[in-house]
UniProtKB/Swiss-Prot annotation:
GO terms for molecular function: rRNA (guanine-N7-)-methyltransferase activity. The keyword Ion transport does not apply. S-adenosyl-L-methionine binds at G79, L84, D102, S103, T104, V130, E131, R144. It comes from Chlorobaculum tepidum (strain ATCC 49652 / DSM 12025 / NBRC 103806 / TLS) (Chlorobium tepidum). This is Ribosomal RNA small subunit methyltransferase G. NCBIfam families: rsmG_gidB. Specifically methylates the N7 position of a guanine in 16S rRNA. Keywords: Cytoplasm, Methyltransferase, rRNA processing, S-adenosyl-L-methionine, Transferase. It is an enzyme of class 2 (transferase).
Length: 217
């Protein structure tokens, strides 16, 4: 645990992500819980060589480099899986409210157990399909899932407040995917005014094939 704590602390310091000692401890505990639950439920790939604390936890925290989560802000984590990126960001920003949604009941059960074990009071896990979310809107929507950007934008358009933002963690070449999402503005009222991408490899070479996509309404 100490090795992971020092590794994560060094990465956060190196990349200008402010993190308290208590948050560091919780983030490392979450990584351990994620590893344990992943033996029971398929939450993240079991074939990866990079440690969970880097590949999944620190990867999620990189969103804080481009978005300033504010007290009272409401955030939806769409297709959260094992709580990524929602739980790490909820630990980092305890005054921001997070709702984690996934259509797979076993994954949400794991998230609920981890949230309870960590004592987090600013995050809720909900077993639901995104189409079933009614009467709620958010300041920010996050997603780490592999769904096409056009599909994520369609879901987000009705769930975001005015001037809301969709932030996705994605991999590979996204030029065609982004172009399709932007072109869809002509077909779908409410699609984002702009879509930008930030190659995370510019932040840290270990994520050379990863990108953050930001869609602004």
């Amino acid at each position: 645990m100490q090795n992971d704590l020092h590794l994560l602390e060094g990465l956060c310091r190196q990349h200008g992500i402010p993190v308290t000692k208590n948050a560091l401890t919780l983030l490392v505990r979450y990584a351990r819980l994620l590893e344990a639950w992943n033996l029971k439920v398929n939450l993240v790939s079991r074939k990866e060589h990079a440690p969970v604390i880097v590949k999944h936890v620190f990867h999620s925290l990189l969103i804080a480099r481009i978005h300033d989560f504010k007290p009272g802000e409401t955030v939806l984590d769409l297709g959260t899986g094992g709580g990524l990126p929602g739980i790490p960001l909820a630990i980092l920003f305890p005054e921001t409210s997070f709702l984690l949604v996934d259509s797979t009941g076993k994954k949400i059960a794991a998230c609920k157990a981890m949230i309870k074990e960590l004592g987090l009071e600013n995050v809720i896990a909900l077993h639901s399909r995104v189409e079933e979310l009614k009467g709620v809107i958010f300041d920010t929507v996050l997603s780490r899932q592999v769904a096409p950007l056009e599909e994520l934008c369609a879901y987000s358009a009705r769930l975001l407040k005015h001037d809301g933002v969709l932030i996705c963690l994605k991999g590979g070449s996204l030029n065609e995917e982004i172009a399709e999402a932007v072109l869809s503005r002509e077909k779908h009222l409410g699609f984002p005014a702009s879509v930008d991408q930030l190659p995370i490899g510019e932040i840290d070479p270990m994520f050379s094939e990863k990108q953050i996509v930001i869609a602004r309404w």
